[in-house]
Each structure stands twice: as C-alpha cells, then as structure tokens.
Amino acid sequence: MAGKVILVGAGPGDPGLLTLKGRRALEQAEVVVYDRLVDEELLALIPADAERIDVGKNVGNHPVPQHEINQILLRKAQEGRRVVRLKGGDCFVFGRGGEELELLAANEIDFEVVPGVTSALAAPAYAGIPATHRNFCASVHIITGHRRRDEALTLDYEALVRLDGTLIFLMSVATFGEIAQELMAAGMASDFPCAIVENGTRPEQRKWLTTVGGAAACIAQGVRSPAIFVVGRVCGLSETMDWFDRRPLKGRRILVPRPRPDSHLLAELLSERGARVIELPAPSAEYLPVELPGAGVTLALTAAEAADALMTALENTGLDARALAGCRLCCVGKDAVHGLQKYGLRPDWSGEIDALEEEDCTLLCREDEAARFAALAPRAKVCPAWRVRMEQAAPIDLDSVDFVAFTTLSSVQAFAQATEGKRPTGVRAVCIGARTAAAARALGMDALQSAEMTLESMAARLEALCAGE
C-alpha cells in the first residue's frame, strides 16, 4: 500500500510561525525531506525514529537537484511511508511545491498541502512594514527576482510601475540593483520609498530603509540571502511600526545549557525578547536505586532531580506518592521545592542545609556531591540518587557569545565540557543561585546572580545588563 506525502510550509524562519497543522504533520512523520532554511527548533519536532533527508537547497546551489527530490518523495511514498516535505516559507509561493506534486499525482500517490507563512508578508511585518494600507496602496504584488542561469529577468517594469501598489521581490539578492534601475527607467521616481529585509523574522534580521535610487548603495553594504526587496509607500511606516528592533535583547547571542526540562522555557523567554538563543545539549539524569524509607523517616531532597529520583523509585516498585504518607519531606533550596511541587506535593520544611534536622534523615543528592553533603550533614544518611551524563556538544565560538545563562550547577558542568581547552575568562554569565555563580566564576567567567531564583528574574537581569551598556 502506498504511503502519503504532506507538503508543509515551515514559515520564513521564526519557528513560532509554524502552523499547528504543520507541527502535527512533523510529529507524525516517518520520513522528513527538508531544505536549508528550516530552523533547528523545527527539526527537533521530528520523531527520533523518523528518517531525515537533508536536500540542502540554497540560492544558486542545489546539492540535490529538484528532479531528484521529486523522485525521493515518490520512492519513499511507494514504500508505504508517511512523508513530510518541509519547505521554507509557503510551499506554493515560489517554493516549487507544484512541481513536486505533479509527479506524485501522475503516480496516484496520496498527498496533502499544509500552507506556511510566506516571507513575502512576514518579513515586512517583522520590519514594521504592512504590505497594504488603504492610505497608501490598493494592491500588493509578489514577484520573483530570480532568473535562470545566464538568462535575463523578463519583467514588465512599466506595468509594475503603473500598478502603483506594493511590490515585493523574493529571491532577488543578486538582482536588486538591476530591478531598481529598471523600475526607474520605467518611470518610477528615484526617491520612491523601498526597503531591504535580510533574514526576515529571525533574531539576526537586518533592514535597510532607502529609496529606489539609493538601493544600490545599500546592496553594496553586503546584503546576503535570504532577503526580500519591498518597493512601496508603506515602507515609510517602518520607523513607526517596527516592533521587532525595539525588543530589549535584539541581536544578543545568549548561550543556554539545558540541564533540566524547564530550560526550554528560559530559551523561549529570551527569544521573545529578541535574543538569538544557542542551546547546548541537555545533560541527562541517570537515576540510581533508592532505598525507600519507612514511616517516621525524614526525606531531604537537595534538587529537583532528587524528587524525580524518588518518584522513579516509587514507580519502579509499583507504588506512588501515597507511600510517603508517613514521611517528613524536606527541601534544601527552592529548586527542590519546585521539583516536589511538580508531583503535587508540598514540603514539610524548606531551607538551607545548615538548618536541617538530621536525626532519622535520609538525604537524596547527586552522586558526585555525596561527600560534600556528608560533611555538611554528618548525622544524616546520605543517599546518592542520581548521576549526570553529559552529552557531546558541538564546539562553541565564545567570541560570538554575549552572555551565558546558567540555571544549575549541571549547566556549568555542561558548558565546561563543551568548552574544554578554552578558558572562558571574562565571558559574562547570569546565574540562578550563589553556588551556580561561584562555579561559573571558578571557570574565570564574569558571573552575576539573578535577583530571584526564577527564570523570569534571570531574563530581567539580562535585560538590565543590556540596557546599561
């Protein structure tokens, strides 16, 4: 039985612009065929057991020719698999989606199309440029500025000028100058407003507000693909309506190690504020056997992972939280409190280790911290409950990072491993907790603490640091 191909528009760059239907298609895919402009955050939605095929299409460089991509889709569908063809922007707006479906239709393969947000409208919107405005234009026109190799553009420039609407040129970095010259030759005033938006909707987005006559000078400043060329009176609204460039962390590159499940929330908080977030692979917790306590025993948890280790031990023995009814639950630090609350439990006591009542106390800690806690709480029974496994990370260019955000000691360890051999002296860090900040300083970093032990407080501290520069 033949499978199915779903063409999914991934949107223009911001992973948050993927549609709900597109997300569902990715999460259910057995094969995903994707292009260069697809964000890594979207690729993370692909099931671990799905086959990934990178066809790497780039402007002027197609490592996998279009006809071969068409054959890949056909072949995988004929194997009976659910195939997602993930394309930047919208599949049917200069995305060659129609060409890919023609072969599938000819071979009676079932297919579906999930439209995406096109860069033609999203990139101007992120630059504060509405594609239409009744006081300025009555139409918008999306035009390709791409030409086949060794061929000239065949556009009716006089007709475009007569339209007196907003003109949006896609795939035209190499032809911006030519297009501007031809528009002026067709009667457009040299001082007519236009804009260039590079990397639209991405944190590294740049824009140039200029005129048709000044476009060539902007291009000489090194405009790179992907970029769009917008010609129209609506470009004059950008200074008033540009919300994207006003975000407090715009253009900042912030490294976020991911040692615990809620670290992605920090990445989201920073992205919403305009930062380019670089995430390190998350160290994983390996839970160790925990001897379950009897009634009347005090259980002291030293981190959120201690709560996870305890609940895992209960589950492995066929028990649940009711088995803790006779125990006194204590939390050393707010992180442990949050970990316990995740399971609907509240501690009987929370505070610092030096105030813990140690009689009949079993203290759950990370394996490599057992000796430290044994010294701090000599009368407690110290039980190593988990160890941290570090994953191999890609090399990090510290010179390109503005800040590192550390949420736990484990995140500092992950960073140290990823930067092994490089001394991060002077690299700025914002940390949750005094111990985390101390560990960062031990690496030679310029580490500061957030006012509170929350992700929101950490984001606010980063904002304040950037505002004070």
Functional labels for PLM-detected ranges:
Residues 6, 30-33, 84, 141, ...:
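Conserved beta-strand elements of the Class I
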Residues 13, 65-69, 73-78, 177, ...:
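Signature of uroporphyrinogen-III synthase
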Residues 105-108, 131-133, 185-191, 318-321, ...:
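A short alpha->loop->secondary-structure connector
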Residues 30-32, 52, 130, 167, ...:
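Short, well-ordered beta-strand core segments
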Residues 90-93, 97-163, 349-350, 354:
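Class I SAM-dependent methyltransferase SAM-binding "motif I" and its flanking Rossmann-like core
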Residues 1-15, 20-117, 216, 221, ...:
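Class I S-adenosyl-L-methionine
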Residues 150-195:
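Conserved anion/nucleotide-ligand pocket segment
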Residues 34-35, 54, 84-88, 111-116, ...:
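General beta-strand structural signal in soluble alpha/beta enzymes
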